Amino acid sequence: FFFFKAHKARVGARTSFLTEMERGSRDHHRDHRDHREHRETREPPTLAFHMKSWKTINKSLKAFAKLLKENATVTFTPQPSIIIQSAKNHLVQKLTIQAECLFLSDTDRFLTKTINNHIPLFESFMNIISNPEVTKMYIQHDSDLYTRVLVTASDTCTQASVPCVHGQEVVRDTGRSPLRIDLDHSTVSDVLKWLSPVTKTKRSGKSDALMAHIIVQVNPPTIKFVTEMNELEFSNSNKVIFYDVKNMRFNLSAKNLQQALSMCAVIKTSCSLRTVAAKDCKLILTSKSTLLTVEAFLTQEQLKEESRFERMGKQDDGKGDRSHKNEDGSALASKQEMQYEITNYMVPAKNGTAGSSLFNEKEDSESDDSMHFDYSSNPNPKRQRCVV
């Protein structure tokens, strides 16, 4: 009797244990299913602007929209940041919108994505973020093949799925430089005014590639901007500060130098002039504010014939560092500078006019004049020396 009673108790305990296991397994599968359904229904990771911060940089973004047109791409990163990059021959321009201006809902699931600046319906991404009528804008990552852009403006709410661009390189500064010179905003404006008549001459067809040359000398620390028309010289002062100096010369397109300085002048802070030893980048101009960072990477142009700058450079070599002549003189002129290749993903406008846009806001001017600083003084003096 006692044997059968004990056996019955053991069977009951085993049955109870199996029931608990089955119940636990069912609960686990149910929880897993609920988690999967929640994951499938929750919102994709979303990048958005802090609208209060965005309003403070809206005018700057409007100016950048005019300067960043050629071969422009937009990269969204999980830092978060938005990088707008534009490329032309011997010049790469880069605008970074910092994390202080952005909000990201899920940093773990948001992957770096790159799209073309041209967006159907909106005309361009820069047009969206520089339009004062925008009240909300979201960038959502729910596919590796495209990026979803949602825009709200007054009584309009629109979204577009933009194909991603793969294999696109973001130009980055190595941070190591044998040269660093800081120019304050007023000095940058002075150089732009000085360059203005030189770049305007190009429209008359007198020259295919008008050059601007930069000469840096160690003793005493000076930086010269030289063209065929005249030259501008700055020495060490509270407006031009020499941190690291090396005898160097740069042969640049005057138009490229003007556009790079114009980018730096927009945010009205000091401009840092640096260089790197890599073949594909010789000169870097950088300006930073709390919310924006501007970088311009310029590579040297090849000189077709000996210019006044080259003749003057030969005279300066007797006073300066002769080893630098072998480094940056004829050796560079005989080599083809490597170039950052950023493919043109821009969609050409029909009949030479801008395509239709959701906002369709008429710009003040679409000509190059809208990017130039006014220049009214007489450039007759062949040499100008600026010392503060």
Swiss-Prot record:
Biased composition (Basic and acidic residues): 306-328
One Pfam short name: Herpes_PAP
Keywords from the UniProt entry: DNA replication, DNA-binding, Phosphoprotein
Chain spans, region Disordered: 20-44, 306-388
InterPro entries noted in UniProt: DNA_clamp_sf, Herpes_PAP
Biased composition (Basic residues): 26-36
Domain of life of the source: Viruses
GO terms, biological process: DNA replication; viral genome replication
TM stretches of this protein: none
GO molecular function: DNA binding; DNA polymerase processivity factor activity
Function: Accessory subunit of the DNA polymerase that acts to increase the processivity of polymerization.
Family membership noted in the UniProt record: Belongs to the herpesviridae polymerase accessory protein family.
Protein name as it appears in the record: DNA polymerase processivity factor
UniProt organism field: Human herpesvirus 6A (strain GS)
